[in-house]
Each structure stands twice: as C-alpha cells, then as structure tokens.
From Swiss-Prot:
Function according to Swiss-Prot or TrEMBL: Peptide chain release factor 1 directs the termination of translation in response to the peptide chain termination codons UAG and UAA.
Family, per entry: Belongs to the prokaryotic/mitochondrial release factor family.
HAMAP family found in the cross-reference section: Rel_fac_1
Modified residues (N5-methylglutamine): Q232
Keyword check for Glycoprotein: no
Name the UniProt record assigns to this protein: Peptide chain release factor 1
A Pfam entry, by short name: PCRF
Amino acid sequence: MIEKLQAIEDRYVELSQKISDPNVISNVEEWRKYVKEHAAIEDIVLKYREYKKVLEEIKATEELLSSQDEELKEMAEEELSQLEEKKEKLMEEIKILLLPKDPNDEKNVIMEIRAGAGGEEAALFAYDLFRMYTMYAEKKGWKVEIMSANKTDIGGFKEVIFSISGKGAYSRLKYESGVHRVQRIPTTEAGGRIHTSTATVAVLPEAEEVDVEINPNDIKIDVFRSSGHGGQSVNTTDSAVRVTHIPTGIVVTCQDERSQIQNRERALKILRAKLYEMALKEQQREIAEARKSQVGTGERSERIRTYNFPQGRVTDHRIGLTLYKLQEVLDGELDEIIDALILNDQAEKLKNMTLN
C-alpha cells in the first residue's frame, strides 16, 4: 500500500512539473490531459502527505517515552494514543480514495418513474417520487427537464421520463434504481384502509454520442399526431415521434414538444441512454456474478425502499436504515439516505479490495 501511494505521489510531482512547463502548455490537448490526471490524484496525494506527517510525529513522540521525566512521559503516551488513532483514520480515508471510480459518476442522468401495482394510487405515488427528485435536484442546484410524461386525470403519472443535469448527479442518484413501495390510506378510500402501491425508478447515465453510436439503419422512426388526456388531439400536425431500435426492440415515444424535430431529438437521447445502460449491464454481469453487491445501483425488480404514511416512516431495505422523517424525505431531503448508501457501498468495496 505505501509503495503504491509513494508511486502516486511521484507521479503527482512529475505532473506538477509538466503542467507548468511552457513546452507542454503550448500543446493544449496534452496539457489538458496532464491537468486532468493531476486533479484526479491530488486528493490521494494530499491525504498521503498528511499521513506521512503523522508518522513523523509518532516517531518524535516515541522518543519522548524514554524520558526520565514522568510527567513528560505521560503526556507523550497520551499524545501517541491520539496520533495512532489519527493514523488509522487517515489510512481508512486513503483506502476509500483509492477505490476505483465509477466512470459515469460525473454524468447527467435520465430518470424513468413508472407506476406499478396499485392503479391510480400508484400513479399518484409516481408523481410524489417525481416531486421528491425535483426538489432534491433544486437543493443541489441541478436542472430538471421533463422529456416525456403520461399523466392521469387526477394528477398522477403512469410514466414520466426526465433528465437531471448537474455536477455529480449520477454519483448520488444511481442508488435510487429499483422498486419503491408506499403504504397509505388513499384519499378516495372511504373505509380508511391502508393500501400498498409501488412505482419503479430507473436511473440511466446520460450517454453522449461518443458513448453510443446508433446506426441509422437500425432505427425505424414513425411520426403521428400528439394526443392528450382521453385521446383528444393537442396538435394539428404529426409532431409526435416513435423511435424503434430494431436489433433490441426498444421503443421510445415522445410527444410533449410541439416540434417534430425536438421530439425526435429527445427520443434519440432516451434511446441512447437505454442502449448505454444495456452495454453497462453486460460489462457488469461478470463482476456481479463474482460479487453480489448489497447496495450497488439496485436491480429494477428489487424492492429498495418503503414509504409508510401512517407511521411517518421511510425504510431503505438494502441497508436497514429507518428514518421517521417521511415528509422531509418527500420534500427532497434525501442526503441522509444517500450518504448512508454511499458509505455502505464503499465499505463493501473495501471489504472486497481486502479479500482480493
């Protein structure tokens, strides 16, 4: 471990020299590459330097233990205990920094929420989840844009697809994929019985054109007239677009925009994200077979969280976390849950790093 850290620090010093070298600066592409690498390892190097400083302090303090002065010796023992604790803490932090980074963490996301079992109540819950993520995004300073929505007459969503753009969006929202369950008394329920409904959330990293190349011969594009609630026409032109990816059978429909071009662009953006997710899942299949992650990003069929209204309770089943802050969570206060999921995920990866 120490040898690896020293090698990283040596590389950091080398990169520091390169990015201030006029010959390198004149080649913008090369300079950017070095700056990116330099930034990627900076946190590890700074933490390692802090660790080395503590080692020096431990060595100096240990020398005081041989002192004849009992008071000085006692002070040294107390300080040594604190330094050893600090050393262990720094090493744990370094290990976390050394964990492989998810290359998609800095990407924007495309989220899909679909009403599951529970009819109208499930559609209302899908809306509640959409509102929760929208409010969370606002708190983070991220931008939300609805790409496609299938609304119900009483204000729910049968399905809603939306993008969230902002720094680190995927790194925090990726843990939301899976089946979310709600337990509450519907407003339409006269008998006051608690109903259980579900909604499925999918979180896809937004794919750039360089990530996924779509062969024009592999897609079929149909245009038709947009329709609103009850099938009434909302547009007199064929502006709605249905894109079918022939090799996979994936179908994406967009009709929210008045322009056929805008709907086509949105449909292709969603398709690109879905194809990228398929490729990622294929890559991760072998890893998943070797190590079943307790948290991961959650299989879509996996029930991950329950929102219990009578008890004001939210329970994340993957880590056994229960919070009696239902309204706060639904108002976008998600950090406490997400931070706990990230810590658990890191602990699992550290355990595997040790085993390997």
